[in-house]
Amino acid sequence: MTRHFLRDDDLSPAEQAEVLDLAVQLKRERWSERPLAGPQTVAVIFDKSSTRTRVSFAVGIADLGGVPLIISTANSQLGGKETASDTARVLERQVAAIVWRTYGQAGLEEMAAGTTVPVVNALSDDFHPCQLLADLLTIREHRGDPAGQTLTFLGDGACNMAQSYLLAGATAGMHVRIAAPAGYVPSEAVVADAERIAASTGGSVRVLTDPVEAVSGADVVVTDTWVSMGREEEKAQRLAELGAYQVTTELMEHAVDDAIFLHCLPADREYEVASEVIDGPRSVVWDEAENRLHAQKALLVWLLRQS
């Protein structure tokens, strides 16, 4: 049966751990898996501009013996004349997998339903699951097994990163805290899904408004941009409403002494995070950025094996 990765909870706890174990192997032995040798082609589709996603998938597919076919929807029929399902049926005749960085989650679900090759969510408005695999790998490297650790996300709790932390963190058995003001909270449905998962993994989920309370005793502190692509007209309002959630050195002092700081990048310095934090000794954002490569390679290898 074809497996897709559209949401973080598309992987069970055991499957998530398996992918992360494989990522550790591929980081240590970069060319040890070559499932795309031939070479086979992977379509990598972009509705949004990208640096880390484009580079990490292109390099990773090449490492696995394949050829990345980079497609911009601005120069294709997808999203215009042709449906996602029809595009998928065309692509599956020629590629081994489809990776799509897009807006709506519904388009990804439509594409996955219409194809027999794996579809990977490289980012949507709702979730950023590939980034979370990289983040969990980074936590493993710097703090050990994520299970039982406390992770606090500060800022826009309704953004795709916050929602992915809820699902992926719960799957990993973490205690996930989202600190956000009213109007910036995660989807109730996503919180409910995360709570259900956490009940079986020993994790927990909390949504709070007080940033100090949320960071107190945290092992991992995370934030993301407050002004995502397409929301530039809301910048002034967002900066005013989210200002109390900036990650500063003072706020980090409420976390455990060896807490780490994560940010998926790009960062708006002096907005969601102070430069002295992102450049400081607790920051592991550059390892996190590199780990996109290893985590996504592992995901592709795993999906191709299952499918």
UniProtKB/Swiss-Prot annotation:
Residues annotated as binding L-ornithine are: 160, 224, 228-229
Metabolic or biological pathway:
Amino-acid biosynthesis; L-arginine biosynthesis; L-arginine from L-ornithine and carbamoyl phosphate: step 1/3
User: Per the similarity annotation, which family is this?
Assistant: Belongs to the aspartate/ornithine carbamoyltransferase superfamily. OTCase family.
Protein localization = Cytoplasm
Binding positions (carbamoyl phosphate): 50-53, 77, 101, 128-131, 264-265, 292
Q: Please state what the protein is called.
A: Ornithine carbamoyltransferase
Give the EC number(s) listed in the UniProt record: 2.1.3.3
What is the reaction catalyzed? carbamoyl phosphate + L-ornithine = L-citrulline + phosphate + H(+)
GO BP: arginine biosynthetic process via ornithine; citrulline biosynthetic process; L-arginine biosynthetic process
A molecular function (GO) held by this record is: amino acid binding
What GO CC annotations are associated with the protein?
Answer: cytoplasm
Give the protein's biological function.
Reversibly catalyzes the transfer of the carbamoyl group from carbamoyl phosphate (CP) to the N(epsilon) atom of ornithine (ORN) to produce L-citrulline.
Q: Does the keyword Cytoplasm apply?
A: yes
